[in-house]
């Protein structure tokens, strides 16, 4: 998925005719397949200086991503982690703007169970490979997402994604 501007306000945007504009967020969701297994990551970059609202939104998804990754461990439910992300976005002024589950498992298929979702009360297990992908989608304005994937351990979450969480502005 590559989407920009108001078109990016759809989490699973399909190709369109939207042209890049100064200040736009560009959402890039991609992965690879190796030995039959999938990877998944998303980064959002900006073409020129983003608006104050877009800066605040990016800070909110970054905070939600990093706090959820720091809390993830075996024994928590997918709902526990999802609810934490929603609470962070609410505190940052973007409550209700995520519109999708916080994450999903990745394996032979790109979307597998267990999910980091309000509908998953089951405990995560060590060895589950899951994404953490908070997003904010404001209809008619912009969308953005910050997604990593990694493995749940007994007492932590080991991130596989090797890419910065810093805001990237392309001049």
Please tell me what each predicted stretch does:
Residues 1-171:
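Active-site neighborhoods and metal-handling regions in enzymes and metal-associated proteins
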């Amino acid at each position: 998925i590559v989407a920009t501007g108001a078109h990016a306000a759809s989490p699973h945007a399909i190709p369109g005719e939207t042209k890049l504009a100064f200040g736009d967020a560009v959402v890039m969701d991609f992965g690879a397949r190796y030995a039959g297994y999938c990877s998944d990551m998303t980064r959002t970059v900006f073409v020129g200086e983003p608006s104050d609202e877009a800066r605040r939104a990016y800070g909110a998804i970054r905070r939600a991503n990093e706090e959820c990754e720091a809390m993830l461990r075996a024994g928590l439910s997918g709902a526990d982690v999802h609810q934490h992300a929603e609470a962070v976005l609410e505190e940052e002024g973007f409550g209700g703007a995520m519109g999708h589950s916080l994450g999903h498992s990745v394996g032979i298929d790109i979307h597998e169970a267990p999910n980091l979702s309000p509908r998953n009360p089951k405990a995560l297990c060590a060895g589950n490979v899951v994404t953490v992908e908070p997003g904010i989608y404001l209809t008619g304005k912009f969308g953005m997402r910050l997604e990593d994937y990694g493995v749940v351990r007994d007492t932590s979450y080991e991130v596989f994604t090797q890419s910065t969480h810093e805001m990237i502005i392309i001049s």
